[in-house]
């Protein structure tokens, strides 16, 4: 989900969905439904659309939910919403996924620099490799939470994930704790130093 337009009065949440039909014999007609809830579990908007997916094929669909008076995500107030996506055959749910999102507006201005929800923000951060001493790359979530809290208490508001793919748990913590993330996958991007290296995953991760 993304929020290209977001103010304290109203926000547009755009949701991109790809649905796969693994049946090899016939097309499948389904309904895609998205429901957005605030942090108290109150529904703030929904959208649904019918579509037909070819046998052994996939279909992409984009939906929009308009939220009035949204609680915007910021460094000081990292408000989050829960987005529930359902794939339905008739009234029966055949698949679903839950996504946590923040509603915010990001802008880069040639004179003012980085703007978050219309306010100028100076990024004060660190490079952070995905490792933690004796535990290596298998970093427990509580350890990440402790380290991020120490950084935030020291005035840090941003993290660059230097040369490593961050875990979803790490990114979720940053969302929850109000920390900006410069999500660098790895220093090779599409141009690998070796034939079989990180760069082979670049397209998949960027998507």
Give short role names for the model-derived ranges:
Residues 124, 186-207:
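Active-site-adjacent "subsite" loops/lids of carbohydrate-active enzymes
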Residues 1-181, 206-207:
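Secreted/periplasmic carbohydrate-active enzymes, especially glycoside hydrolases
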């Amino acid at each position: 989900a993304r929020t290209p337009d977001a103010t304290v009065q109203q926000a547009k949440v755009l949701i991109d969905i790809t649905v796969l039909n693994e049946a090899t014999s016939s097309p499948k007609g389904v309904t895609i439904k998205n429901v957005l809830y605030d942090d108290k579990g109150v529904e703030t908007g929904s959208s649904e659309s019918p579509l037909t997916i070819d046998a052994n094929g996939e279909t992409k669909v984009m939906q929009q939910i308009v939220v009035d008076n949204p609680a915007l995500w910021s460094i000081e107030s990292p408000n989050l919403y829960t987005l529930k996506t359902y794939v339905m055959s008739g009234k029966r749910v055949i698949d679903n996924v839950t996504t946590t999102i923040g509603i915010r507006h990001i802008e880069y201005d040639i004179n003012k620099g980085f703007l978050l929800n219309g306010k100028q923000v100076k990024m004060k951060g660190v490079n952070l490799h995905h490792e933690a001493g004796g535990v290596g790359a298998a970093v427990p979530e509580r350890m990440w939470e402790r380290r991020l809290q120490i950084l935030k208490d020291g005035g840090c508001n941003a993290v660059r994930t230097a040369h490593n793919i961050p875990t979803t748990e790490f990114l979720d913590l940053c969302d929850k704790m109000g920390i900006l993330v410069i999500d660098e996958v790895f220093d090779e991007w599409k141009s690998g130093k070796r034939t079989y290296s990180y760069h082979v995953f670049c397209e998949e991760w960027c998507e």
